[in-house]
Design a protein with these regions (language model features):
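Membrane-embedded transmembrane alpha-helical bundles that form the catalytic cores
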Residues: 2-414
Length: 414
């Protein structure tokens, strides 16, 4: 059996146009079944497993074995906590189970930073499965999830279109969506949306991201390294080129994932909503990698604020929210990887959000003072909004330069 699995080709999800020929052919019966108000549950499982297996194999089975161990580990934790939550609500058991659920991703992220080798527990998609697993544990405690069947749990974790890189869904929304087969008119709308997303995704990922990342970026990096110094003009070009390449690559991927989800009768959450039109950093995080930022907002930021408020760690609520912003974004930086530039990226955005909130509060105070003095408030016309967009865009691009890791090559690798 293992030899047969080893002989399977490696098929990178959404890695090339040929992938869509395979996946659309495979899920066409699913869409036809939905059109006639039928879900072919076992066929869906087989399709998902086939594409996940080929995603993780290609001569080796270590990633597949890691996935199997991971699923058993998470299932044991969720089963235990589901039964425990029916009779008790101890916070320390909740913290312990959440930590144990996070252990695999902690090992995967920390090991390369310690000895430079990849963890045997790692596999494509482990980060996004962890968000789903921990999210379920949190929602079991909150009472959002009243009942959880293991086959529904596995179906949620192993949903093929979003397995490798999201978008990050929530169990309750996904499960309710799965159980409700769309009406024919809605299904046809989802088909039209899928075609549109796939076309835009081809433009974003296979044309624009390819031009920026494969054609323009390498020579710019070489020129910047040859020029040397702490900073040079080529670094500015790298900043914008990488920033747009990152957006087009990931936004294109997200469009593909949503399109294939639609064809399987599931409306996965959108990930990007014109992020470069944001007027401030807070709005940016409501438009950029939305399923990730909303996950951190709901399950990390809001809970830190509640805990710090309940324990009265700070007298001022603005200080509480500021500390939560920084810790939340630092944690997001660590999630990307244990390197100084990912951590600096998180800290950069954490401080940026603190400054953003401080300016909003300051502007409100100044407007009140101006009103008392009989003067008009600061203008909020389209030109001011445009200025906010321009400033936010460039601040974000600076953060993407940090995120790219190129400054590490420029400053420390000789």
């Amino acid at each position: 059996m293992m030899e047969l699995i080893k002989q399977l080709p490696h098929i990178e999800p959404y890695g090339n146009p040929q992938y869509f020929l395979y996946v659309i052919t495979a899920i066409l019966p699913i869409f036809i079944g939905l059109f006639f108000k039928k879900r072919f549950g076992w066929y869906e499982i087989l399709v998902s497993l086939f594409f996940i297996v080929t995603m993780l194999t290609g001569g080796k089975t270590n990633q597949l074995a890691a996935l199997g161990i991971y699923l058993i580990w998470q299932m044991v934790l969720v089963l235990f906590y589901k039964q425990y939550r029916k009779v008790r609500d101890g916070k320390w058991i909740f913290y312990l189970v959440s930590l144990l659920s996070l252990l695999p991703i902690i090992f995967v992220k920390v090991q390369p930073a310690i000895n430079g080798t990849q963890s045997l527990l790692g596999f494509v998609g482990i980060s996004y499965l962890t968000f789903r697993s921990v999210g379920i544990i949190i929602e079991l405690r909150d009472g959002v999830i009243k009942d959880l069947k293991m086959w529904e749990y596995l179906r949620f974790l192993l949903f093929m279109p979003t397995f490798s890189s999201g978008p990050i869904d929530r169990f309750k929304r996904f499960n309710e969506n799965y159980k409700t087969i769309p009406e024919r008119d809605e299904l046809l709308d989802m088909l039209a949306e899928s075609v549109r997303y796939i076309m835009w995704g081809f433009l974003y990922k296979f044309i624009l991201a390819h031009i920026l990342g494969e054609i323009l970026l390498p020579p710019l990096k070489n020129l910047a390294l040859q020029t040397g110094g702490v900073f040079n003009y080529y670094v500015v070009a790298i900043m914008y080129t990488f920033g747009f390449e990152l957006f087009f690559d990931f936004a294109g991927y997200s469009m593909f994932a949503i399109a294939i989800s639609n064809l399987m009768g599931i409306r996965s959450p959108i990930n990007f909503n014109k992020p470069f039109l944001s007027r401030d950093l807070k709005e940016f995080w409501n438009r950029w990698h939305m399923s990730l930022s909303f996950w951190f907002r709901d399950f990390v930021f809001m809970r830190m604020v509640m805990v710090m408020t309940r324990k009265k760690l700070f007298k001022n609520r603005n200080v509480t929210s500021s500390v939560a912003y920084v810790l939340n974004m630092l944690l997001m930086g660590f999630w990307h990887g244990i390197t100084w530039f990912y951590i600096a990226y998180g800290l950069f955005h954490g401080i940026g959000l603190v400054m953003n909130d401080a300016w909003v509060r300051k502007k409100k105070t100044l407007n009140k003072e101006r009103k008392k003095a009989g003067r008009p408030p600061f203008p909020e016309n389209r030109w001011i909004q445009l200025l906010g967009m321009v400033i936010t865009f460039h601040v974000v691009m600076v953060s993407f330069l940090i995120f790219s890791g190129f400054l590490n090559d420029l400053w420390f690798k000789k």
